[in-house]
Amino acid sequence: MLTSAIKKQIRSSFEAAKIQLPNFSNRSSQNIMIAEISKTLSGEYPKSNPILCVEAPTGIGKTMAYLISCLPIAKANKKKLIIACANVALQEQILYKDIVEAKKYSSVEFEYALAKGRSRYVCIRNLINLTEETSNTQTLFEDALLWDEPPSQNQINKLSEMTDNYSSTRWSGEIDDLESPPEFSLWQKVACNRFTCTAKNCEFYNDCSFFKARKKASQADVIIANHDLVLADIINGNNILPDVNDCIFVFDEAHHFAQKALAHFSINASTEFMKTSIRQSQSAIDQISKITNQKTSESHIKKVDEAIGELIEVITNFEYLDDVYLFDMSGVSSDVANLGKNLLSIFNTAFGNFLDQKDNWQDYCKRNTVKQIIMDNLNNIIGQNDQNLSSIVSLLNAFTQNTHTDTPPTSNWIVKSKLPNKKINYHLNTAKIDVSNHLQSLIWSKAAGVIFTSATLTSLGSFDRMNQQLGLKEKENRYLRLASPFNYKSVDFIVANIKASPSEVFEHTQELARELKKRINKEAATLVLFASNSQMQMVADLVEKTIECELLVQGEYSKKRILEKHFEKRKNGEGSVIFGLDSFAEGVDLKGDNLNHV
């Protein structure tokens, strides 16, 4: 029920926002959004679920609308408010600007925290182990997962830099807080993951950036997350976020949510990954046997190689379109299914043997004293292998499964890629094409409230497509389309007269660079958005030395640092150019003289 006390808090927050926020503009569409969110979440529509879909065009002030309306209701009902964004840019916009402003004008006292997946945080144990000089105890692991090949000097320097910065508290342990993040392959070796994490059994538990962040999130009233984290956490049993029924969810940029959900119900693994994984798991088993003085279990490397060879003999003859072969909706062909089941049987046996050895190792550690560095490194290797073998078994299980007529079919396909040694790698993929029932049972039927909002939720003016993808029923929920505050009819849309087609990569890139050199004002603020990362890098190389002002390229710095540098340049009256991918613009607030040209 929308009580008089809650109404008063909402009105008080709105009036305070008018005073506290510079350049505040009263928009009727924002007022309607606040009212409808409040009514929906408070049960003012008894025949509807507490679910509202709001299409709110750019400029309405969506974030303020859902903060003003959701906060008092969440607090009054002792629920957590989960704000889930589609990308890091919007997440940081809310964290560093919108939520800070809300603390000033909100009539409700609240604490907030940022929640990210484990992989965004460093594992300090792994970082220290990799940074330390190689000792006799570490030679045992030379051929294991910690290093696929000897590290370069740059990698060693980067590890030392991260260790020093973390030890001196100059770095929080989040990859997004690094001014210059390490390459992905290096970060993977030091990032947290649930398979290698020993939680409270780790000597660095009290200093762990991930568990510090999780503790802060557990104490917060508002948790800022992203779509991927919410989906992963709910699917895996709420390890980071509160129980679904204790939460009110706001999915911002919700037009991305259906695609994100599909991705979380898809699996893939390549033939080369399978070969590498079986070898690495056997290496781990051999290391366990050597330390525990037990007989090593049977190797399955030869059987896996032979089974994969037989599978490749069949799939190499398929007719691929742009290196992709798509099976029909009845599932994979019988010959591929039989070969896949044979491979699955081998991996099931190998995985079972591996888990037995894992148990033996854990029992051995309980009964014997093992050097900490040996235990840490081997636990890390075991965790990685556990994850790899588990994912392969899941993939083969789903890939070879018979299609049932009473359930939505799955999509199965193979993608070819060429390795540096010119060898062909085959990626097996399987994905559900309809996850609406899963979303309904996991989230919509349990949540205390759900708000979907974006500038683009409808297709041809209808919410039907969104309802179909997310498993929502129009008669059971609330829907709202708001008018734009901008007069788009007065705006011209101009397409540059670029002669080269985008398919002519070299010519198009050269012409694009020439046009940008002509168009970029060295004294102004410019944002250039690309659909291709590789083209963005090439154009940056071509224009960097001639534009005579700061060029900030996405990927070279964190988004937060790029914006800080950009604002600093503009404050000093200097020109600044940002090169980013298309998603960079979502959630980035560049007002006034901070953006002159897109």
Residue map of PLM features:
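A substrate-engagement module of RecA-like helicase motors
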Residues: 2-18, 25, 47, 58, ...
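Walker A/P-loop NTP-binding motif
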Residues: 38-42, 63-77, 97-101
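A contiguous, basic/glycine-rich beta-loop/short-helix subdomain that forms a polymer-engagement track
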Residues: 188-218, 234-240, 361-492, 496-499, ...
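Conserved interdomain hinge at the start of the Helicase C-terminal
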Residues: 498-531
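Conserved helicase motor "Helicase C" RecA-like lobe of SF1/SF2 P-loop NTPases
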Residues: 531-555
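A short beta-strand element within the Helicase C-terminal
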Residues: 590-598
